[in-house]
A protein has these predicted regions:
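Short secondary-structure boundary segments
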Residues: 69-73, 208, 247, 425, ...
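Residue-level signal for inorganic ion chemistry
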Residues: 9, 41, 60, 112, ...
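Acidic, Mg2+-coordinating active-site environments of NTP-dependent enzymes
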Residues: 74-77, 123, 205-357, 386, ...
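Phosphate-binding loop of NTP-binding sites
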Residues: 94-247, 251-259, 459, 483-498
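Short, basic phosphate-binding NTP loop
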Residues: 1-129, 139, 149, 447-460
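ATP-dependent carboxylate-amine ligase
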Residues: 1-20, 37-42, 52, 141, ...
Length: 499
């Protein structure tokens, strides 16, 4: 973060400075976890489901934080903001904020983040926005790998992509930062536009329009309206703006009419009209893709170290952004080929000592990413001549389409040749999945929780089998992967003792 005096922060965000030396400086980025606050940091007093950040201001200050952004005076150094009242929004940040105290802090945080971007932009900071229904985090991670080889780069950890994580990430930029990669999510129309207002992007990539958050939006067309807000926020082509669009998705390709930026296309299907496309795609025995990359400057062989055929499209988007930013194509190819998964529980592939392979893709799930995970599992199982086990939870936020989409998932399992399903949990979606799978004749086990699922899988799988673990975040299905790994370690320890 760029150093700022307490008085300047109060002026920028329009709050009242209390119990603080006006000349005291914030020299480190913001923190909303008091345990991470340290000398020179800015503490964010945000309300949550179980605790209120205002109750932890004193702890943050005692740990060295310079001051807090707060919505009420608790007798500690702070910039105090006026509560905004209950917000009419489906954003997660406002779910436990009846008085609008968190909304006031977040508005101030966004204002401060915009000030930082405006301060750094004349010095050469390039902001890149990435959005889409699926693949945002993987693409963001790939792009960060490429750009870090070119200069100091700030990118969010994991999926810090909403009204909290986005400005939080922006404040990590300083005068040395050359690239700021912003992952932008949405649960409604206007959300991406809001994030783009905080950190106006020079280059924006839209990956796809799928069915994630379908229950919030109502239709794919409304999702496209929201995702396209990113390209609307780009500067003109004359001012250096570039929109990177997926030629294989009609709703994304149509966004070209919504921007005055330069438009370039990528295509994992090898569409001839795409500026960046892949042909000759092959997968190895753990579903890592190799392909021929076609670019405006020639053809290049690419071998990815991440898993899943769907990663080809993500890689193409990252490649296109980097090349359009001026990075040499050969350097881009070298960096993308060396990239390994940086965010946990996203296509993490682990082979246990017994030979069992666990594909942990449990961070989130929607119909598109479910199919991609199943495809990767099947590819790996086929290459190993082993059985495939789908350990699945619900796909959340599908609204009225919940039952239909989970029925379709069961049908996709059958069509793909997956015979073993462990359906975890008691949600409506999981029940619909299990009931349809049983109707279709799949070997289906209904597990009430992650422990029951792990115990069943451990007792049933063969030593070289492949297990996919995937569900929406709320299901915490990564516990199945953790339990299976721990069980294997226990067996190994006992074997060593017996030996």
């Amino acid at each position: 973060m760029i150093p700022l005096k307490a008085a300047d922060i109060a002026r920028i965000v329009g709050g009242e400075l209390v119990h603080c030396d006006p000349q005291a400086k914030v020299t480190r980025p913001a923190e909303f976890d008091s345990r991470k606050a340290g000398p020179g940091s800015l503490f964010l007093a945000l309300p949550g489901a179980r605790v209120d950040g205002h109750d932890f201001i004193a702890k943050a200050i005692s740990s060295g934080a310079t001051l807090a952004l707060a919505a009420r005076d608790v007798g500690e150094p702070a910039v105090v903001l006026t509560p905004l009242g209950k917000q009419e929004s489906n954003a997660d940040a406002f779910a436990h904020d009846p008085r609008g105290e968190g909304a006031a802090v977040l508005r101030a945080l966004g204002t401060l983040a915009r000030f930082v971007v405006d301060t750094l932009a004349p010095g050469g900071l390039d902001v890149i926005g990435v959005t889409g229904s699926a693949g945002k985090t993987s693409t963001k991670d790939m792009l960060a790998t490429i750009l870090r080889a070119e200069g100091p780069t700030v990118a969010p950890e994991g999926s810090f992509n909403n009204e909290i994580g986005h400005p939080y990430t922006v404040l990590q930029a300083d005068h040395d930062t050359k690239y700021l990669v912003a992952e932008m999510s949405a649960r409604g129309v206007g959300h991406v536009a809001h994030l783009a207002e905080i950190a106006p992007p020079k280059v924006g990539a839209v990956l796809n329009v799928g069915t994630a958050h379908l229950g919030e939006f109502g239709s794919r067309e409304v999702i496209a309206q929201a995702k396209g807000e990113l390209v609307e926020a780009l500067p003109s082509a004359a001012a250096g703006g570039v929109a990177v669009l997926n030629a294989d998705d009609d709703l994304v390709a149509a966004m070209a009419t919504r921007t005055s930026a330069k438009v370039v296309y990528f295509s994992a299907a090898g569409a001839a009209q795409a500026d960046y496309r892949a042909t000759d795609i092959t997968l190895d025995d753990v579903a890592r893709a190799s392909f021929t990359l076609h670019t405006p400057s020639g053809q290049f062989p690419v071998a990815l170290a991440v898993h899943g055929a769907h990663q080809v499209a993500n890689a193409l988007a990252a490649i296109a952004v980097a090349v359009e930013l001026g990075v040499d194509t050969a350097d881009v190819v070298a960096a993308i080929s060396s990239h390994v998964a940086a965010s946990r529980r996203r296509m993490e592939v682990q082979e246990l000592p017994s030979g069992l392979v666990i594909i942990n893709d449990s961070y989130n799930a929607n119909p598109d990413s479910m199919r991609a995970g199943i495809d990767a599992m099947l590819r790996t199982a086929t290459a190993r001549s082993s059985a495939a086990w789908a350990v699945l939870g619900q796909m959340g936020e599908l609204g009225a389409a919940t039952e239909q989409e989970h029925h379709k998932l069961a049908e996709y399992l059958q069509e793909s040749g997956v015979n073993n399903l462990v359906a975890v949990g008691e949600s409506d979606g999981v029940r619909a999945l299990a009931d349809k799978a049983l109707e279709l004749g799949l070997n289906t086990f209904k597990a009430s929780d992650t422990r029951a699922a792990a115990d069943y899988v451990a007792a049933q799988v063969g030593s070289r089998d492949v297990v996919l673990v995937k569900a929406s975040y709320a299901d915490q299905l990564w516990q199945v992967a953790d339990l299976l790994t721990a069980a294997q370690e226990t067996v190994d320890d006992e074997s060593e003792v017996d030996g």
